[in-house]
Each structure stands twice: as C-alpha cells, then as structure tokens.
Amino acid sequence: VHGHYPSVPMQPAARLTDLHVCPMVTGVVPHVGGPIVSPGAPTVLIGGLPAARLGDMAVCVGPPDSIVAGAPTVLIAGQPAARLGDSTAHCGVITLGCFTVLIG
C-alpha cells in the first residue's frame, strides 16, 4: 500500500550506557565491547537516559566503535534511533535497550 513501510519488528530503544558486543580481535586481544557513551540525545530521555542514535560512539578495548544502523523511520535529533540488535562499525550489535520503549 502506498505510504506504508514494510513490517519492521519492534525493538527496545537503545540509550547511553546500554551495552554492545564486539567480535573484533587485535592480534590476540578480543575487543569484547562495552557501553554506548556519546554523544547521544541529551534532550530525549528513554527510561531516564539519553537516547542512542546512528553515529553515537561505544567503548571498545580496541579503537572506538560506533553505531552504524538504526530505525530508518524514527529520527531522534535528526538521526535514526538505535535499538537492541542494531549493528556497530566493528560488526557487533547492541545487546541492551529499554524494554518499555519499542521502536520499529
């Protein structure tokens, strides 16, 4: 139907401090992953924490990681909203989100 997007599963919204995993390895040192840290959207709080978005950074043992996928139809401060399961630049995924706020 014109004007409708294909069905996208609803996923919990990601926020600063939510975690991601990172499968990369530098030499013999695994990157592991860590929390989403900046910049986020400080004017949009989800479960009391700033919303995470496409382009936001995440802590990693190796070089800094960043969010490279988000909800194409939900923009927060001009960027796609990040969700549980969205990808990072190191081929990892966001593993935590606010389960009371679902974004499709």
How would you label these PLM feature ranges?
Residues 1-104:
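Intrinsically disordered, low-complexity proline/glycine-rich segments
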